[in-house]
Curated annotation (Swiss-Prot):
It is found in: Cell inner membrane. Belongs to the UPF0761 family. This is UPF0761 membrane protein Shew185_0314. Its main location: membrane. It is a multi-pass membrane protein. Keywords: Cell inner membrane, Cell membrane, Membrane, Transmembrane, Transmembrane helix. The chain crosses the membrane at residues 4-24, 45-65, 102-122, 137-157, 182-202, 213-233, 247-267. InterPro entries: UPF0761_bac, Virul_fac_BrkB. It comes from the Bacteria. GO terms for cellular component: plasma membrane.
């Protein structure tokens, strides 16, 4: 009897996952995330140099980050532009150096282009959440400016904190020395989960439950790490793009990776936004099933079945939700 109950519970669990995946698929088709990802990839490439320039400018304003600029650049290139090659890094650093020597008007233009990227991300995620109420211009600009200024500082602070933790003497003990490589290897994954979690909870202009955002963040982080390794493997093992594009091969490489990255980000957002919709639908379906089962119970007891009208079902469901 216990085994039958366990099998039934497992079956219900898998059916629930299957129904959620079907609901997620309908949502993905409806929201056309491939088109949204293409738009965000284009805006990202347009604002890549301004974003890096603003980031490095913010970090250079704090003396504590001056000694780890190379470490921060390595972290960004390794995790966000995998297998793009040294050529891309040299060009980006050269562009950033040229941009930082510009006039006040030029620097202001860089900030505006960087804010355009943050605004595009904000609009795309709020469209996924079906948010009807828009932020005021003052609130939106304040949030964009906060992300632009505090984001680089948080990245730098997290790397400084990681370096400090790794240098602690507690890791020199024999019992913990084997844990250090594992901890270092898991750091990018932890950073990805934290970044996606913050993105899915802060950007939507409505309340997002922590567990829903955490689920979307974990899925997105896993896909992001797998995508990095898979894309790097493809670029190194199947370099057919070089035969086609020659010296310009780095351009499609960067664009394809940025596009795939945004597909992963939007997929995690869709999972986070779809969870409450699916749970509400399942809850309302259970309520309706229980209400419609009442006439059958009356008939089994010999009473004339009291058929509920659709208005009565709706009213009872509203009462149940209010309770």
């Amino acid at each position: 009897m216990t085994k039958k109950i366990e099998l039934a519970q497992i079956r219900v669990l898998f059916l629930g996952i299957w129904h959620f995946l079907l609901h997620l698929r309908r949502r993905l088709v409806e929201d056309q995330i491939n088109i949204r990802a293409g738009h965000l990839a284009y805006v990202t490439l347009l604002s890549l140099v301004p974003m890096v320039a603003v980031t490095m400018s913010m970090l250079s304003a704090f003396p504590v980050f001056k000694g780890i600029r190379g470490q921060i650049e390595g972290f960004v290139y390794e995790n966000f532009l995998p297998a793009a090659g040294d050529t891309v890094q040299v060009y980006i650093n050269e562009f950033v150096g040229n941009a930082s020597k510009g006039t006040a008007v030029g620097i202001a233009a860089l900030v505006v282009v960087a804010i355009m990227l943050i605004s595009a991300i904000d609009k795309s995620l709020n469209n996924i959440w079906r948010t009807k109420e828009k932020r005021s211009v003052v609130v939106a600009f304040s949030m964009y400016w906060m992300v632009l200024t505090l984001g680089p500082v948080l990245v730098g602070a997290s790397l400084v904190a990681s370096s400090y933790v790794i240098s602690l003497k507690v890791f020199e003990a024999e019992a913990l020395s084997g844990m250090l490589p594992i901890f270092i290897a898991r750091l990018p994954m932890l950073f990805s989960v934290a970044a996606f979690l913050l993105l899915y909870m802060v950007v939507p202009n409505q309340k997002v439950k922590f567990l829903h955002a955490l689920l979307g963040a974990i899925v997105a982080a896993l896909l992001f790490e797998l995508g990095k390794k898979g894309f790097a493997l493809y670029v190194t093992q199947f370099p057919s793009y070089e035969a086609i594009y020659g010296a310009l091969a780095t351009i499609p490489i960067v664009f394809v990776w940025v596009y795939l990255s945004w597909m992963i980000v939007l997929l995690g957002a869709e999972i986070t936004a779809a969870m409450p919709e699916y749970l509400d639908y399942e809850s309302s379906s259970d309520d309706e099933t229980a209400l419609n089962a009442k006439p059958l119970a009356d008939a089994s007891q010999g009473d004339s079945p009291s058929v509920l009208t659709s208005a009565e079902v709706t009213a009872l469901k509203a009462v149940a939700k209010s309770e």
